[in-house]
Amino acid sequence: MAPQRRAATKAPEGNGAAERRNRSSTKKDRAPREVQRLWQRPWLRTAGLGAGFVLTALLLWSSLGADDGVAEVLARRGEVVAGRFIEVPCSEDYDSHRRFEGCTPRKCGRGVTDVVITREEAERIRSVAEKGLSLGGSDGGASILDLHSGALSVGKHFVNLYRYFGDKIQNIFSEEDFRLYREVRQKVQLTIAEAFGISASSLHLTKPTFFSRINSTEARTAHDEYWHAHVDKVTYGSFDYTSLLYLSNYLEDFGGGRFMFMEEGANKTVEPRAGRVSFFTSGSENLHRVEKVHWGTRYAITIAFSCNPDHGIEDPAFP
């Protein structure tokens, strides 16, 4: 029950008090009339309505909690996923490429696991990315490091870090870094082969396979615009199976930056977690995008595989 207020004793009003009350009343009467006149101005009325629509849109966006409206979470950051796989119908993308029996996808889908790469391995492989990216970095929000080709984001361009830095690279990386990289790749390759019922030896590491570091800095070039929806098989013809190993944690290390499978009705999202592996067939059945990162820094490594040995690349070697 609300506490009762004791009524204040009113003092008798003199002429001065009455005049002050009349002036105050006049000001109050004038204020609504001034507001009314302002709203009668077309430009201000339009601006006010526009602000109302913007506010409504922002509230709706906040309530949905996703860039693309309705979304279902395939894997939450806080859960440990032993193994989750969803089969989806294969697209026709693979028909326009040379087929390899026992490898080219006939069973398509997407999977997530948190038990293939340990958190400790994820921390160690992230340190490899941090060491390499410390040599450069994009002016925009997305930087890449490709240990295979040597590509490194520097400003608005890319350099070959092996040629650009020469022997100094041996003071940045170690043989252990490259051994760990190879072991992580092998574990991911075996996971994909098992999930899709194919031989691991039929999968060939392909390009581009690279580290990514994303923050909230405004894009400076098209390479920084990582958030557009795309199909890997269309963007990179060599891709048959795509995987992502996350090296940082959603809502701990960064905000936004969730991975989204684009579907009619409801997108399927994967919330990054250090050590989490997300993998999928690379055709149009898995159209996807990444949310813009709103704060913090998101680290991941994209590891791609092809069924075509002509598109294969070797593991990077310590220089």
UniProtKB/Swiss-Prot annotation:
Residues 1-34 are annotated as: Disordered. Its cofactor is Fe(2+); L-ascorbate. Fe cation binds at H230, D232, H288. Belongs to the OGFOD3 family. Glycans are attached at N215. PANTHER family: 2-OXOGLUTARATE AND IRON-DEPENDENT OXYGENASE DOMAIN-CONTAINING PROTEIN 3 (PTHR14650:SF1), PROLYL HYDROXYLASE-RELATED (PTHR14650). It is a single-pass type II membrane protein. GO terms for cellular component: membrane. It comes from Homo sapiens. The chain crosses the membrane at residues 43-65. The active site is at R298. Binds 1 Fe(2+) ion per subunit. Its EC number is 1.14.11.-. Residues 1-42 are cytoplasmic. Pfam families: 2OG-FeII_Oxy_3 (PF13640). 2-oxoglutarate binds at R298. It is found in: Membrane. Keywords: Dioxygenase, Glycoprotein, Iron, Membrane, Metal-binding, Oxidoreductase, Signal-anchor, Transmembrane, Transmembrane helix, Vitamin C. This is 2-oxoglutarate and iron-dependent oxygenase domain-containing protein 3. Residues 66-319 are lumenal. The keyword Cell membrane does not apply. GO terms for molecular function: dioxygenase activity; iron ion binding; L-ascorbic acid binding; oxidoreductase activity, acting on paired donors, with incorporation or reduction of molecular oxygen. Its main location: membrane. Residues 18-34 have a biased composition (Basic and acidic residues). Residues 207-309 form the Fe2OG dioxygenase domain. The lineage of its organism: Eukaryota, Metazoa, Chordata, Craniata, Vertebrata.
